[in-house]
Each structure stands twice: as C-alpha cells, then as structure tokens.
Amino acid sequence: MKIKDTLNMGKTSFPMRAGLPKNEPIWQKKWDEDHVYEQRQKLNEGKPTFMLHDGPPFANGNIHMGHALNKISKDIIVRYKSMNGFRAPYVPGWDTHGLPIEQQLAKQGVKRKEMSMTDYRELCRQFAMQEIDKQRTDFKRLGVMGDWEHPYITLQHHYEASEIRVFGAMAKKGYIYHGLKPVYWSWSSESTLAEAEIEYHDDKSPSIYVAFKVVDGKGLLDTDTYLVIWTTTPWTIPANYGITVNPRFDYVQVQVGDKKYVVAAELLDRVAEEIGWENPKILKTFKGTDMDKMTAQHPLYDRTSLVMNADHVTLDAGTGLVHTAPGHGEDDYKVGVKYGLPVVSVVDAKGYMNEYAPGFEGVFYDDANKQITQALADKGALLKLDFFTHSYPHDWRTKKPVIFRATTQWFASIDAFRDQILKAIDTVDFKPSWGKTRLYNMIRDRGDWVISRQRAWGVPLPIFYAEDGEPIIEEETINHVADLFGKYGSNVWFEREAKDLLPEGYTNPHSPNGQFTKEKDIMDVWFDSGSSHQAVLAARPELSFPADLYLEGSDQYRGWFNSSLITSVAATGVAPYRGILSQGFTLDGKGRKMSKSLGNTIVPATIEKQFGAEIIRLWVATVDSSSDVRVSVDNFAQTSEAYRKIRNTMRFMVANTGDFDPEKDTVAYDELGSVDRYMMVRLNQIIKQVKTAYDAYDFATVEKTISSFLVNDLSAFYLDVAKDVVYIEAKDDPKRRGMQTVMFAALLTVTKLITPILPHTAEEVWPYLKQPEAYAALADMPEAEQFDDESQLLDIWSGFMDFRSEVQKALELARDNKVIGKSLEAAVTVYPSEPVRDMLDDVDANVMQLLITSHFEIAPATTKAPADAEQFDDMAVVVKHADGEVCPRCRMVRTDIGTDPKLPQLCSRCAAIVEANFPDAVTNGFDK
C-alpha cells in the first residue's frame, strides 16, 4: 500500500476542459428529445404567470451579436422565473412582411411585375419561412429554451386575422382616416415610411438664402423690400406658397446698399456675416404679428407667397422667416392648411420633379437642387449658396435619403387618444428609468401614424371603395375580411374580386349598382408586429395579456414599444406591457457600429466555434446592456478565463463530494464547526443577493456575486482550508462529513443559481448532485434559510478574515525573504490587541488549519512583540520556519514524526488515522 492510498483524494469524471463547442449541441439535442421546456411548463401549472413577450426579429439573414445579447437576456429571465415559482412560457416570434424580403427576391432575379401578385407573395412567404428556419437554429444554438415548434409568425393566418380586428377596433372608434398629408417618402422603395423606419446619416446639402420681393406690405413695408428665407432643400422652392414668421419675434427692415431686406432682429448679425452684408442699417423694427397676411412675389413663378404666423418658427438657424411648402413638410402643412394654401407635391413617387415644378419636369430632385439654385441666381433672388454636412433622414432598409412628400394615405389619428396613451405610460415600469421620458416625449410629439404602404408583401388594408369613391370601413366588412384571413390567409385579398370579399348580400347606398373596388395598399409592418399583444398574448391560451415585460433594443422606443402601445391603448384601453427593459446596441471594440463595409462584424457562430455559446451567455451576464456594449474577441477570451475559474471551482467540489451521500452523510447545521456554519451563512447571503439581482434583471450583479463567492470565499479560502480535513481525515470523520455537507450545499446552490446563465454547465454538473429532477432546468431556485446565529457569525468571521489577510501579508514577506517556501512550512506567532484576541477566542476553530500553517500560537497578553515582528494596526506577527520534518501524508512540518513505532514515517495525527482505518498499512507497512 502507498501512503497516497490512505488519502481521500477527490476523483471525478467531470472533465477539466469543458469542450463547449462540441458538447453544447449534445445537451441541446437532449433537451429537445426529452421535451425539457414542456416538462418545465407542466411542473409550473397553477403557479402565477410571468409573461415575457418576445419582440419579433425580422426574418432575414443570420443572427448578429445584438440578437444574441437580446435573446440570451430573455432566456436568463425566463429560466430564472420558471425556476422561481412562476409559470413563464416563452413563445418566440418572427416579423415576416416588408420590403427587405422583396429586395432579397429582386437580388435573386425575381421580377415582381412579370408574375401574379399571389405567385409573388408565395415566393415571399417561402423566403421568410426559410429564414425563420435558419434563425431558429441560430437561437437554439445559443441555448435559448422556448416553444420553438410553435412560434408566432406575422404571416400566420390567425395572426393576420387578429391584426385586421385590431385595425377594426381602431376604425370603429374613428381613429382611421384617409388624407393628403406630407409623409416620409422613400423614392428608393417607392413607399411611405413610418418614423420607426427612418435612420439618420450625415449628408452634404446645399444651404441657400433667397429673397422674396414684397408685393403687399400692409402699409408697413415698401414693395422694394425683400423677405429673406433660408433653406437646405432648394428643390422645394417650386412648392413654396408661403413664408412663416413667429408672431412674438422682433423683425427688422434693414438697408444694405440700395436694397432693403427683412430678417429676425436677433439673427441680423449672423445673417449679415453669412451673406456678406456690410453695415446693414436698421430702418424699422416690428413684430411678426404685424407681417401677418403680407404677400411676396415667388422668385420663379408668377404667383405670390403668403406671409403667415406660427409658433414653430425658431431662432436656432436661418433668418426667422421660414420658406413654407405645404406639400413637403409637417409644420408647413399645418400652417398652410390653417391659411388655406394649396397642398402640392412637386416630385413623383420615384423622386422626379413633376408638372407642378414648371421648367424642371423629369429632373431627379437632387439634381434639381443645382438647376433651381441657378434659376434663382439668374433671377437675382439668390443671396448666398453654401454647402454643409448635417444629419439627414434615410430609409432604414435601402440606406437612401428620404423626402417629405404630400400623398394621399391612410392614417391612424394619434391626436384622438394621445392623452389616453400618455396616461397608460404612467402604469409601466421602465428599466432604465429614462425610458419613460423617452417614450412619453415620443408619443407627446409624434404626428399621426401613416399606416398605408405601396408594396406587395404585407397584410392588405381591409378597405373597400364604393362606386362614388367613398371608402367603406365598416365593422361588418372588416370582421368578414378578418374571418376570411383567418381561414385562407391574406392572399385571399389578391385572389378574389372585391364583391367576393364582402359579406354575402352586402349593399351600400354609395354603390347603387352593387359595384365595389378594394384598397391596393398594405399595412405598415409596424402595425403587423404592433398587433402581437392581441394576435399572440390575448389569443394563445397558455399566454396572458398584458405582458409583464417587453425587452428589446432602445431603438424600439420608436418602433415596437411605440406601435404596440398605440394599438393596444386604441383597441383595449391599456398598455400591452407592465414593464419595459431596454438595451443598447452592440458595437465593435472601438465603439463603432458593426458593418460589413468596415469589416468589423463579429457573429455568434464564430464565437460559438471558438469558445462556445456558454461563453457568449456568460459575457451577456457581465455587461451593462442598458447602454451600448462593445464587443471584441478579447472580451470573449477574458470571459472564457472567468468561466474556467467557475468551472474549476465547481469541479473541485464535484470531486470532493464524490463519496458523499446527502441522504445519510449530511451533518446538521448545529453540529457543524464554526467555519462551516459561517460558510452556510455566506451561502445564505449569496442566495438572497443573487435572487434580488435576478428579480431586478441585474445580471451583472448575479454573475459578480456568484463568481466572487466561488473564487474568493470558496476557492481562495474555504476549499483551500478544507483540503487538510477532506483529504487527510478518515472518510467518515464528522469534521470531514461536515465540510462535505457545506461543499455539497454550495455546489447544489450555485448550480441552481447559475442555471439561467450557464445552462449547459449546470446540466453537466447536475448528475453528480444525485437530485430527483432529471435536469437542473427542472429544479427550483434555492430558498434562503433562517439561522439564529447568522449575524453573530458574520461579525466574528468578518473580523477573522481581516486578521487572516494581515497574517497572509506577513507570510508573503517571509516567503520573499526566503524564510519559508509554502505557508505549510511556517510557524506563526501573533501578538494581538485585545479585540483581536477576543475575536480569536470567539472563532472557536483550529486557526493553524485556517491559516494553512504548521504551527500557530497566540503570545500571552503580557508578552511584547520582538523588534523584527511585522507590525499591523491591531497586532504584530512573527513568521519563522516551523521546527521538525515534513509528514509525507499531511505535508505539515511536525516534531512528532515517528512517535508511533508502527508507522514511523507519519506524524501522530496521521498515524492514528491510518491505524484506525487501514490495518494493512500497519501490518505490511507502506510501499517504498
């Protein structure tokens, strides 16, 4: 027999190397085959519901790091809630209609106008479903658990029917109307855009100052005076029908050479510098209200422009007199309608100037900028041309600039119930808290929602037209269309004539001959996803409305959060969510947006192959995702190192509880040693802290708390101390079983606590824990216990940990001075202050063992510390090399080796243990 055969050296099949890229898919396959998600739902039947509603990603392309951050965050929450007393179903969704899919088909050579609408839409559907299959595989590879076989998809028949009913509820309340208004228009997509479909990029634009000659100055201004406007869109000058001034501002008439001009008094110096006026002389000062209804000559056409009053005019830029084209701006439209001006758009759907811009017909609007500027110069009306770079709206899909253009569209009136929406926001809990202000301001300031789109792939607007052109939006017709969509899908709209889409026997006084036509436009895709609260939450029996949580990127304050809120309040009177948790964007390591053109993209699949999905999940749990998050391969390398520490600590506990049967070997709390009870109390603290952090969606605190406990409390202290007991003492020694009790409790608790973040690792540990549940995901979160001596233990051991830290400093100095090598070679004498002496009395433990030294003594209170002692605030420490020899079994330096003649190689402690438990060693001796 060898000496090592008498030691309880932990052995385990739990591998040191995780092999995550290879092993994760094996676990994921097992979860699918054993229906672990479904088992969890069954276990939670009858419990309170926690409803996290998945915002649907667009079904186009493989997932990126933003998707991973979002889906993993959701998975952590749902897994935690499922393990902590809630029924928390998770139904993933996909957004499937819209321009990107049409663009993808065009890239594949599909010619929309050369096939029937139904055939084209079928190609769109097939493409969307293929993309869903790709993304579903990607999301499952991240370890995200949910009802993947029954997702919600915005092209599903029942979904489209529910969306039509939401539209019907809004129409019934009078919120839907048809109107000619300026809207964001994408000439590159040939369609209107919602605010959520706009993104801003820097663009170079012309900046021009233009003079309009006064025609009727209302007795205040001479006809040889010029009103000066400033604009960055010269192409809209042909659409000018007015000039707007602020009634409260002061304006001045100034003499410059032989010309007279009018600008806002406060902007005179800036305008003079810009245009190059020398010594402008103020002739008159007056209020904007005095200029109301003056007229000025249009600089290009034989008509006048009306001067109007409105409060939207500011002094931030320009001249204080605003060029007003009611067909090309929201404020322009509002003031123009108030004053009875025509609403004219001078560009067509493709962005080319039309017949309302004589002299420029057929010219692309951006090219027209140059031609119109030249025409103004030829007429003597151009005072200054310059160029500047500014942030300008672009189509979020095509990345091309957009324009404001008046077209006849279908709108959802926000004014009609804006106050109700704002009140609903007050019922919602926001994380971060600034989200409330952001959403509130967006709703407060937003215009009406243009919901019609001039595209093919989407849900048709369920509107008919009578013979006289009167729109038909009636409860009866809308419900009938919803029923048809529920049965056949929205393609039925394109397959049948209008009369076959109307209820049988339907008549309308506006169609005496029974003739009807149908709307050609489709719904805004934000109306699609924004109806999910009714199409999914209210429709599926296992779900509930309103949701407890919507969790998406901060861009969704103007997207899904916004559209869902509007449709929900309109249709049901309440917000669709009780809480909103928003996240920032994922950027590269330098803080730049990831893009293929910059070559700085990192995709989850790459990280999974190199490190594993578990490392992405742990990374998600370490970052503050409430703001933008930087991503680099280095991040994952660092996270992988943090994971290694977690895994190694858990592996040590697995190995050293291998011979521990929790049913028969557990030591009662009251019978544990002081340090063991302290660790149980610390474990109790960890449970409380981690669950509080989970409840607050504070994953970083969850991870930090668990990692710190594993690395600092366990690995660097308790487990290190435990080796002398767990390895050395007899297998069933009460002290050993006590420490194993703590280790097992820590391992079981930590495994449960990390399951939401590291589910693959938790499942790998789980079989070693001998629990009744087949999977960690089917277990419940640990509950904190009540220990009567908790505060007392924390107080004592907090003092001891400070004491230990100072002794370790003294040991480190002794090591540096070559007095000792390892701490087990040390003999430590302390000269403590009275409070430290009392604390050491209270610790009630083997301090030598706790310090991992071979000798420890407390000097008598009357003894003064020698001059060479290491001095600390509350004690002095002397470290010497321990006297004696190293015991080959316990590795301590002992003076009693050989005192037992039967086992002369061992110290008396080891000899007693071996003699009692390994009689063969006594009889035959140890192998050499």
Swiss-Prot record:
Listed EC numbers: 6.1.1.5
Which sites bind ATP?
Answer: 596
Top-rank taxon: Bacteria
Q: Where does L-isoleucyl-5'-AMP bind?
A: 552
Alphabetized UniProt keyword annotations: Aminoacyl-tRNA synthetase, ATP-binding, Cytoplasm, Ligase, Metal-binding, Nucleotide-binding, Protein biosynthesis, Zinc
The subcellular location is: Cytoplasm
State the protein's name.
Isoleucine--tRNA ligase
| Species assigned in the record | Lacticaseibacillus casei (strain BL23) (Lactobacillus casei)
Lineage of origin: Bacteria, Bacillati, Bacillota, Bacilli, Lactobacillales
